UniProtKB/Swiss-Prot annotation:
Keywords: NADP, Nucleotide-binding, Oxidoreductase. Belongs to the zinc-containing alcohol dehydrogenase family. It is an enzyme of class 1 (oxidoreductase). This is Trans-enoyl reductase pgmF. The gene is pgmF. It comes from Aspergillus terreus. The lineage of its organism: Eukaryota, Fungi, Dikarya, Ascomycota, Pezizomycotina.
Amino acid sequence: MASTVPSTMKAWQFSSASPTIEANLKLNNNAPLPDGANNLGPDQVLVKVIAAGLNPVDFKFAEIPWLGRLIVGSPSTPGMDFAGRVVATGPNTKSVAVEDLKPGQLVFGRLDSPSKFGTLAEYTIAPRKGCVAIPPGARVIETACVASVGLTAYQSIVYRLKDHTGKRIFLNGGSGGCGTFGIQIAKQMGCHVTTSCSTPNVDLCRSLGADTVIDYKKTDVIAELKKMQPFDLVVDNVGVPTDLYWAAPSFTNPGAPYVQVGALAVTPGFILGNFFKARWPGWLGGGKRPWEFMHIESNVQDYEQLGRWMQEGKLRAVVDEVFGMQDDGPVKAYQKLRTGRAKGKIIVKIDETWED
C-alpha cells in the first residue's frame, strides 16, 4: 500500500463550527491520511474519493454547541457520502455476507456517522457494510449522492409497511434529496404517492412519479391532506409545518406510522417535543400515531437494490449542482445546501480530472 498511497492528502477541514462549519472551512494540502489508512482494521475499505455528496447532517451535528466537537473531533473533514475507487481492504470477517471488494473497483457508499476524517478529502475509510460496487452504466459522480438519502428513503418506506401495493403515502417535502428518491422508491413499491413542495418544484415531483403534489406556497398543507383519503404512512422530510404530526390523526388511518426524517434544527425544544411524540401516552396529551425519528443502518443488500434500480433506469439521482474541490467550492456548496432550496442533491467533485 505504501507505494500507492501518499503520506498526506488534500482535505477540507474546519477547527470551529461557530457560527457555521463553512465559515471555517479551509483546504489543507498536507492533511494526514485517515487513522489506520496503512493498517486497515477488519471490514474496512480505504477509498480514493472521486466525489462527495453533501447532507445537512454534515453540519447539524458539528454545530451542536460543545457536543459537536466531542462527536466529530477537531480539526475535522465533513462529509459522509462518497463515490470512489477501492485502494485497499482490511481483513474480511464475513460479518458482511458479500464478496470481497477488489482494489481498483469503483464503489459508492457512506460512513456510519460524521467523522473527523470525512469524505471531502482525497481518501476516506468506509465500513464494508457501507460500501458497494457501482453498477455498470451508472454515472460515477451521481452515485456520490445516493447512499444516505437513498437508504433513508428506502428504509423509511420499504421497512415501514408490510404490503405496499396500493398503500397511500404522504412524503412531506418531495424536491430535496430524500424526497426525490422517496417518490421514485414508493412508486417502485406500488404505492400511491402524495407529496409537498414549492411552486418551482411541482413539475419535478410530478416527473418523478408523484400522483398528487401539494404546493405549500399556494395552499395549506394540512388542510389539503384532510380533504383526501386517509394515508397509511407519513414520511416527514422537512419538519414543517411543525404541527403536522399532531394533526396526523385527521388525515391518516389508525396505526399509520409517522417517520420523522428532517428537522429545521436539533434544539432542546425539538428533543423534548420528540419525547412527547414517542413516549408520552396519547390519553395524557402525547402522540396518537406511532412516531419515530429515522435512523438508518447501512446494509449492502439495500444499496445493491438501489443500484439495480439505477442500472434499470427506474431510479435516478436528481443533482442540483456539482461544485469543484478548489476555489471555495465546498464552502459555496454548504452555503447552498443550508438554504434548503436545492432541487435534489449537491455534490463536490474531489477528483476534478474525472469525467463520466
